[in-house]
Curated annotation (Swiss-Prot):
PANTHER family (alphabetical): GLUCOSE INHIBITED DIVISION PROTEIN A, PROTEIN MTO1 HOMOLOG, MITOCHONDRIAL
Protein residues bound to NAD(+): 273-287
Protein name: tRNA uridine 5-carboxymethylaminomethyl modification enzyme MnmG
Oligomer status and interactors: Homodimer. Heterotetramer of two MnmE and two MnmG subunits.
Positions that bind FAD: 14-19, 126, 181, 370
Known role: NAD-binding protein involved in the addition of a carboxymethylaminomethyl (cmnm) group at the wobble position (U34) of certain tRNAs, forming tRNA-cmnm(5)s(2)U34.
Length: 629
């Protein structure tokens, strides 16, 4: 027998990285929000790698922060180490990566959620949605509680019909031996959603006291203070190193001899695994010419001896895992504390979503995170933030927010999912972004703070600091463009000392900065600014001047693309009425139902000829008959 448990503007199912961002965003925007999760002790839990950031993913964390999300602030308070990656490469691929104290990360984020006005956190398992006339009206829990809501966001991670697999051992479970969500998965199928079966995995954890670190290579954090959040002013300087070692020929021999016992190769696993995070069995089989593979030993926190063995994700049986660990230099006498495992779970086919992450089948229902077919905490958090924003906008009667591919990696991620779909766990890569020179780590605030402020997630105080930073950047660029540096002896000496060609004539300071060997600090020595500028402002001035030509080229590409994005396609267009479309294109267009010509052009199976035909119909006003007429 059910009972009425309350009414809310937004209900979030799940409290992982997607759920936390969704719940916090909705509540901070003024929506009365309820977060329901199976286990309150597992809020913001990191079931796999104890880290945040990395290539592309680190930029997503910066974008989350620029929009007013929480992940960046939280990892800045709880990391044990932070490093800037790809510093020897161009600014487009630089990214921050933090090693997390996973327990502090959980504790801090749960505390933030508990202290947030408008936000209620409750332990309960959702089994069904309340759906009336094609609209989601609320949820029903295992205990019979009926909660009504204007909007619902599902962020169930890998819990949907989750199964843990090690060798020939297989049992129903969520990550880390949590209770799985079985009934909700079945209910989504009843509602007509297409689900797919995906797989991911995690490596064993070992006892730090039993590692011989003298046989490994130290991997320290950066000496320079780093932060994901643009608001962070206090930095953690007491960092803990990670350690690098390698598999051995003995490791590979042991794996080869036990492949028949791996769930990956015995046929036990049916789900599709992540291409960019393969198991150690996969690496040994697919790259059998490599004598060794990197293994990083990553502490899971400051107050635990557990160490995450990155690079050794596996579904081999427990006894093989133990023996395999002891073939690795430094781990000869190691004690395993937790076994690695593979986990299979249900995910929704993401082409069933609008770019707002609302489902097409059921109005007011949103999904975010691994349920949408992605992998990674950062991808989940970015989706959770956008789903929470849009669910709140709907509940408050405001216009929903869609980030374009030119705006953010989050925009690339969501557009890829809803337009192209994915047949494997999707991981964000810099190569997926065609405008990656515009989507940099350093300029996330310049790209997205206006959006965050407009929707109410950025405070006035922070917005004022942001506008002041923008003003300083423009003023310094103008100053350097107006100053002529003459070939004085001290100028020529500095240029010679850094390996440059001496000046023949006077040159604008901005033009001198464009030289590859010159930095802003060199220019500052020659023509110092009267105003004290932050490192962030100096960095922006240097990047914007040095890469001006390339940035301008990218902006021109964006403008051309926007012409296609601005050509809207009616939501209720009937593609069956456009007889000249190729049959594959017609089916794909019906499945995805793109909102613009730009989105239509990115659908696999829709070729330029189909786009031209569709364009004629749209531009001439010959809209195909509407299905419901």
């Amino acid at each position: 027998m059910g009972y009425n448990a309350g009414s809310y503007d937004v209900i979030v199912i799940g409290a992982g990285h997607a759920g936390c961002e969704a719940g916090l965003a909705a509540a901070r925007m003024g929506s009365k929000t309820l977060m329901l999760t199976i286990n309150l002790d597992m809020v913001a839990f990191m079931p796999c790698n104890p880290s945040v950031g990395g290539p592309a993913k680190g930029i997503v964390v910066r974008e989350i922060d620029a929009l007013g999300g929480e992940m960046g602030r939280n990892i800045d308070k709880t990391h044990i180490q932070m490093r800037m990656l790809n510093t020897g490469k161009g600014p487009a691929v630089r990214a921050l990566r933090a090693q997390a104290d996973k327990f502090s990360y959980q504790h801090e984020l749960k505390k933030t959620i508990e202290e947030t006005p408008n936000l209620t956190l409750f332990q309960g398992m959702v089994e069904r949605l309340i759906v009336e006339d094609g609209e989601c009206k609320g949820v029903i829990t295992q205990a019979g509680a009926e909660y009504t809501a204007k909007t619902v966001v599902i962020t169930t991670g890998t819990f949907l019909r989750g199964e843990i697999i090690m060798g020939d051992l297989k049992y129903s479970s969520g990550p880390n031996n949590q209770q799985p969500s079985i009934t909700l998965s079945e209910h989504l199928e009843e509602l007509g959603f297409d689900l797919v079966r995906f797989k991911t995995g995690t490596p064993p954890r070992v006892n730090s006291n039993t590692i011989d670190y003298s046989k490994t290579e130290i991997q320290p954090g950066d000496d320079k203070p780093r932060a994901f959040s643009f608001e962070t002013t206090k930095f953690i300087m007491d960092q803990i190193p990670c350690w690098l070692t390698y598999t051995s020929t003995e490791t590979h021999r042991l794996i080869d001899e036990n492949l028949h016992r791996s769930a990956m190769y015995s046929g036990m696993i049916k789900g599709t695994g992540p291409r960019y995070c393969p198991s150690i069995e996969d690496k040994v089989v697919r790259f059998n010419d490599k004598p060794r593979h990197q293994i990083f030993l990553e502490p899971e926190g400051r107050n635990t001896q557990e160490v995450y063995v990155q690079g050794l994700s596996t579904s081999l049986p427990e006894d093989v895992q133990r023996d395999m660990l002891r073939t690795i230099p430094g781990l000869e006498n190691v004690e395993m504390m937790r076994t690695g495992y593979a986990i299979e779970y249900d995910a929704i086919v993401p082409t069933q979503l609008w770019p707002t992450l609302e489902t097409k089948k059921i109005k007011n229902l949103y999904t975010a995170g691994q349920i949408n077919g992605t992998s990674g905490y950062e991808e989940a958090a970015g989706q959770g933030l956008m789903a929470g924003i849009n669910a709140a906008c709907r509940s408050l009667g405001k216009k929903e927010v869609i980030l374009g591919r030119e705006d953010a990696y989050i925009g690339v991620l969501i557009d890829d999912l809803v337009t192209k779909g994915t047949n494997e766990p999707y991981r964000l890569l810099t190569s997926r972004a065609e405008y990656r020179l515009l989507l940099r780590h350093d300029n996330a605030d310049l790209r997205l703070t206006e959006v965050g402020h407009e929707i109410g997630l950025i405070t006035e105080e922070r917005y004022e600091r942001f506008t002041n930073k923008k003003l300083q950047i423009e003023q310094e660029k103008e100053r350097l463009s107006s100053i002529i540096i003459k070939p004085r002896p001290e100028v020529q000496e500095l240029i010679r000392n850094i390996g440059g060609s001496e000046l023949k004539d006077g040159i604008r300071a901005s033009d001198l900065l464009r030289r590859p060997e010159m930095t802003y600090e060199h220019i500052h020595l020659l023509v110092p600014s009267e105003v004290e500028l932050s490192d962030e402002v100096k960095e922006q001035v240097e990047i914007q001047i040095k890469y001006e030509g390339y940035i301008e080229k990218s902006l021109q590409q964006v403008e051309r693309m926007k012409k296609m994005e601005n050509k809207k396609i009616p939501v209720d267009i009937d593609y069956d009425a456009i007889s000249s479309l190729a049959s594959e294109a017609r089916q794909k267009l019906k499945d995805v139902r793109p909102l613009s010509m730009g989105q239509a052009s990115r659908i696999s199976g829709v070729n330029p000829a189909d786009i031209s035909i569709l364009l004629v119909y749209i531009e001439q006003g010959k809209i195909a008959r509407v299905s419901n007429q």
